Amino acid sequence: MVERFLIGGVAVGLLLANSPTLAQAPARTTLVNPSQSYRVAKTDYVVLNRGEVEAVIVNNAAVDDGKLPGHRGGYSGIASLKRGGANKNLFVPSYAGLNFEHIHDGTSQPREILFEPRHALMELRVIDASTVELYQAPTPTWGLESATRYAILADGTIEMTFECIPRRDTFRNGYIGLFWASYIHQPESLAIHFRGRRKEESNTSWIRATSPRHGAAATHVHLDDARVWKRDNDFPLSLVYNRSNYRYADPFYFGVNEDLALVFMFRPQDEIRLSQSPSGGGVGNPAWDFQWMIPQYEVGRRYQMVMRLQVVPYEDSESVWIRSAPHRKALASDAVQKGEPTSRDSR
């Protein structure tokens, strides 16, 4: 079993564990937890099965075999998601879901820099039969080190825990912008659904949100999210800042594919921004996305985000709300321990 990684030939596990800033709360990934054992996968993907769900977790290498035919390089996360023995992958087979897509600071940069998570090498780590991680060493441009844990729970829900440490002072606007994309394979509807209201309204109801084209009315923020992010006028990622007129009330949304609801749920304290594109994965293949912003970041400090993805039979919005309740409750009660560095207590 591999007990810790090396950077430049220097063991860093003990150094990080003894850091008063980083050791204030239990680590949930191998990023700063030297006691967490793992093995490095011999292949570019690992299959997780539990409940009625099969999830294939892949690094960002290209794969073309019987399990992942034609999977393109650059797309990491859940390369295949199936439920109940169905043959159809709910995600676009050549792409992925919960794919770590962008690192940015609001400044205009070349495409390869804004898509750096696609290009920097990822190591696939196996924790146990139900848990794997994608580790990415400090990236060449941004210097962001990260570990993404995918754990399949008893009912087949995927819990994703992302931990990162900025290793260099590279984010010129003082914040870190992170973006995850899920490319959905030919759903009946391109819409996503959440509880919220229009900006000018006072009553909360179910919202059926669509985007007329890529980058238009793309992002929905929380009712109380009044944060303003400095950015260049020619910043090229059109999904990031182009907001809709909707505000969500609960950190949750879902879309429907093959009579199944894909339910994305988040911790309230992570202040996630919901995003969507009608054509992110090609014609008829929408992208159902989310963003996490880390304000006033500190070099060497650990930041953490937790979310869950559930696949349940779709009847109507209320049935999805009821079925997802235990997971939403668990995320809401996942209180940040005193001293744990997160986006909220780093301001």
PLM segments and residue spans:
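Low-complexity, serine/threonine/proline-enriched polar segments
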Residues: 196-240
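Acidic-aromatic substrate-binding/catalytic surfaces of carbohydrate-active enzymes
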Residues: 36-117
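Boundary at the C-terminal end of the N-terminal hydrophobic targeting segment
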Residues: 17, 21-25
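Beta-strand-rich recognition/accessory modules
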Residues: 25-51, 224-345
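Acidic (Asp/Glu-rich), glycine- and aromatic
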Residues: 153, 157-211
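Bacterial N-terminal signal peptides
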Residues: 8-17
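Extended, loop-rich substrate-binding clefts of extracytoplasmic carbohydrate-active enzymes
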Residues: 103-157, 164, 169-171
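Bacterial N-terminal signal peptides that target proteins for export
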Residues: 1-9
